[in-house]
A protein has these predicted regions:
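N-terminal segments that mediate ammonia production and transfer
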Residues: 7-120
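A short, Trp-centered hydrophobic/proline-enriched beta-strand micro-motif
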Residues: 2-6
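ATP-dependent adenylate-handling active sites, centered on carboxylate activation for C-N bond formation
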Residues: 10-17, 23-33, 97, 110-347, ...
Length: 360
């Protein structure tokens, strides 16, 4: 994972790149006049690093709100700060300083070409790759820890890593506390498990600080436990691994698969009839079964806008004032990603979309 910028003094050019999944952020702000009459560009891993620059114009990007209402985070290259952009994952940029001309190119993309191998061979190959990646993070002579929820993904990483410590958080409410699983695995590995129970007051009390560190609006509440995990870990270690991203890679989300009811409905009802029903309900007020008929009628391009969906794009248009409805809606934005995988199966299309949006 990386985000870096290199200054080529001989060619008077700037080169910047971001890792393939966008784990590390990289923001930039092109300027027609950097203060000396010549063009320039600000860049950094946080937008707040631009705020004190005298020629940085502080203004809200009204176009950013429309897709945010559906996806619950800033998922476009444009940020909520007017004129500030995110370099997309797996992209690099070059800037010719004398002219200010910027060029952005993609250097990597997912490959869904089928490769026929025995299942056991896939398992062995995957295990080898994961162990190699985990081991690469242990090169530095520092303590390494892992975030451990007790679920499959983080447990696998912890078992491969054998960290110095594991960190877990739970909620001070019986039905939302799974730290006992993390403690059980840590004991089996012979590793100390550091735990914290988050109270309701602590949960809501952290939101303002979280928003400050995120630079942009973020309404996915998983950021709260991650905030406390990072806070605990930073007091004791400098490197932490987690199981983030595994659901997108290995189709772990429940919405990647049709429910038994959907499979039965698709088997009994012809596609033409399902599409007619799907088109009909799009013009009707919401009712129980509305989403069911929509999902059974069409391919993902017609309804799937990512696993973090809050408001349907049509609902967003009903609540936004005219000044804020000029940006792309989520469906339009996602369509650009679907165009990259036109011949893939429905599952791969959903995965490609989520992998493309996971850290943009």
């Amino acid at each position: 994972m990386y985000a870096f910028v290199i200054w080529d003094k001989k060619k008077n050019k700037l080169f910047g790149a971001r890792d393939i999944f966008g784990i590390k952020p990289l923001y930039y702000y092109p300027m027609a006049d950097a203060g000396d009459g010549a063009p320039g560009v600000l860049f950094g891993s946080e937008i707040k690093s631009f705020l004190d620059y005298p020629h940085f114009h502080k203004a809200v990007n009204k176009k950013a709100l429309r897709p945010y209402m559906t996806l619950q985070y800033s998922a476009t290259e444009e940020t909520f700060f007017e004129g500030v952009y995110k370099l997309p994952p797996a992209h690099y940029f070059t800037v010719d300083i004398p002219t200010g001309k910027m060029n952005i190119e993609r250097y990597w993309d997912c490959d869904y070409s089928a490769v026929e191998k025995p299942f056991e061979e896939y398992v062995d190959e995957l295990d080898e790759v994961v162990h190699e990646s985990v081991e690469a993070h242990r090169i530095a002579d520092v303590k390494v820890a892992s975030f451990l929820s007790g679920g499959v993904d983080s447990s696998y990483i912890a078992a491969c890593l054998m960290p110095d410590k594991t960190f877990s958080v739970g909620f001070d409410y019986t039905n939302f506390n799974e730290t006992n699983y993390a403690k059980e695995l840590s004991d089996k590995l012979g590793v100390e498990n550091v735990r914290k129970m988050i109270t309701a007051d602590e949960f809501f009390g952290a939101l303002e600080d979280i928003q400050y560190h995120m630079d942009e609006p973020q309404s996915n509440l998983s950021s709260v436990p991650l905030y406390y995990l990072a806070q605990m870990a930073s007091e004791e270690v400098t490197v932490v691994l987690s199981g983030e991203g595994a659901d997108e890679l290995f189709a772990g989300y429940e919405w990647y698969e049709d429910t038994p009811e959907m499979r039965s409905f698709k088997k009994r009802v012809p596609l033409g009839v399902r599409r007619a029903l799907g088109s009909l309900v799009q013009h009707l007020p919401y009712f129980k079964g509305h989403n069911f008929l929509t999902k059974c009628a069409e391919v993902p391009e017609r309804w799937y806008v990512g696993q973090a969906k809050v408001f349907d794009p049509s609902e967003v248009d009903k609540v936004l004032k005219p000044a804020y409805d000029t940006g792309k809606n989520a469906a339009e934005m996602c369509a650009e990603y679907y165009k990259q995988v036109p011949n893939c199966c429905e599952l791969s299309k959903k995965q490609y979309l989520d992998l493309s949006l996971i850290h943009i």
